[in-house]
Amino acid sequence: MIPRAIRSAAAASFLLLACVAGHAEPVVAQRFMVVAAHPLAARAGYDAIRRGGNAIDAAIAVELVLGLVEPQSSGLGGGAFLLHYAARDAKLEAYDGRETAPARAAPGRFLGADGRPLDWPDAVVSGKSVGVPGLLRLLELAHRGHGKLPWASLFEPAIKLAREGFPISPRLNALVAADRFLALDANARRYFFLPDGKAKPAGTLLKNPDYAAVLARVAAGGADAFYRGEIAREIAAAVRSHKRGPGDLVEADFSAYSAKQREPLCGAYRRWKVCGMPPPSSGGFAVLQILGILERFDLRALKPDSVEAAHLFAESGRLAYADRNLYIGDPDFVRAPLAALLEPRYLAARAKLIDPLHSMGRARAGDPGGVATSYGLAEPLELPATSHVSIVDAEGNAVALTASVEAAFGNRQMVRGFFLNNELTDFSWVPEEDGKPVANRVEAKKRPRSSMAPTLVFDEKGKLTMVIGSPGGHSIINYVALTIVNVLDWGMDIQQAIDAPRMGSRNGPTELERGTKAERLAPALERMGHSVRIRPEASGLHGIVRTATGWAGGADSRREGVALGD
């Protein structure tokens, strides 16, 4: 049977894997929907559900293929966050597969001998940036709790593609060609480049037998095949022998790693319930804060592309990012006052700080009252490269999965067919500010703060209404919050909401998406006191919305994703 998404686009484009633009209209389906960043990955999830699998099965199949065909964004060498909704008992679960710092990590990890932060390449393109990968432990934990299809069967699509080959997509080709560090790694150079040093062109059939071999071992032996033994030893040795900056990862760090189940973070937005990831991700918290502040304003009376709407969204973002930067860190190390920071009276007080006619500039973190904090404020480097998957299966179960290796191609080190993460640069590089320890400072076995924001939205009757998430570094929070507003307040369909111009603030300049209608707002915003920055936006939003007859899926036209449904 031909998936609906293929019916709505040229079948030849799907089969040749040309760059797939977002549809002008959302893809509609009655039974289930899979939205992912690459057609082959989405197809793996689609096929898993067609074989009788559920949302968890599909998510595993999708992510294993993404690690092959979109290796710059996520993979076995990285981590992930996953929200799962079980329709039968209306149960929501959050899975944390965030990377951890090695046991030998210390707060001054990214400081030089002079006490100043290291230069970008010396921190990122090095062994120091690599944390213990968490993806496979997360997928295994979720499958043990909810999977229907055999674990090994979910690896088959990715193994087959890795052995037989897949065409290099235009986006992957462009990213490889533009990266000045990738060819420094011998494995990556052999894989992606021609003998003359040029990147292999788009359309080239790329085979990855090393990746297939790793997947085959994990399919047969579970995640232990990755975390205990030869593979873990090889990764740790590669990190410790990095020429630019050796790391301190050892095999024992792998065997000690575990993914965690956490309590989802939920809050009200008008008549809806919005749920996201708790810390160590700041995504769920900050999205809820932005929405909670915006709830005090009548957004429906404004046009989505108006100066007034852009002003309110940017100012709400400033306030949320200010609190995020001060309070949020790994909950095993940092006790953030989440309930107080999301309390309606606190958010109402924060909303009153917004002047409808003038920007507040840089916002200061709030004090919810009765909360003692001794944390300093410092912000990590932004390195956006991530992937998001949204799935609703035939039983109404849902998955929102956001996975990452941090920067594009992680630390640029390829081991056994996949890239290692550089997630430890998500820690704050400066461990103290004004004599106070920073909540997100580096510590042994700690998980760095993330901005990933896999999100589920429910209506007033508790029915699943929306599945959404995005890549994009620190901007993920703004991307997800604005898309939710586009759907819930301004009545856009999911494809319109995703493709709408990006705008917002991360408590710095007000950012407007280059080449869109948002650019036109710059002069008026500047007159209101905004410092405006016009830039391309790296969102890769993938979403699903309930309709009267089933589901509508949307994939971000800024990337190569598709929605497949039946």
Region annotations inferred by a language model:
Residues 24-43, 47, 55-221, 226-228, ...:
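Noncatalytic scaffold domains of N-terminal-nucleophile
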